């Protein structure tokens, strides 16, 4: 089974299958989503102290903050050639 992994910056990688949305962090509703995820313990900050440029929403209700532009993450997600891939060993 081939798993497509997406680099979201600074060596952080997310499974492409788990991504539901990639959005910009500027709007009030997205800021609320980030705060609610922080309160629930479902926020993953992958910015390494840099400015948040993309908010990735996953199917498990985790919210991931990335310092990479949303367009860049989307381009990596839609590219035919995965940046990183892993194959599950066959028993």
Swiss-Prot record:
<dbReference type="Pfam" id="PF04025">
    <property type="entry name" value="RemA-like"/>
</dbReference>
<comment type="similarity">
    <text>Belongs to the RemA family.</text>
</comment>
<protein>
    <recommendedName>
        <fullName>Putative regulatory protein Moth_0891</fullName>
    </recommendedName>
</protein>
<dbReference type="InterPro" id="IPR007169">
    <property type="entry name" value="RemA-like"/>
</dbReference>
């Amino acid at each position: 089974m081939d798993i497509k992994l997406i680099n979201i910056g600074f060596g952080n990688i997310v499974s492409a299958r788990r991504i539901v949305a990639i959005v910009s962090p500027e709007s009030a509703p997205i800021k609320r989503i980030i705060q609610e995820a922080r309160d629930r313990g479902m926020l993953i900050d992958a910015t390494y102290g840099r400015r948040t440029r993309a908010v990735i929403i996953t199917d498990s209700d985790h919210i991931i903050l990335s310092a990479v532009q949303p367009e860049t993450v989307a381009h990596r997600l839609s590219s035919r050639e995965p940046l990183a891939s892993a194959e599950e060993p066959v028993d």
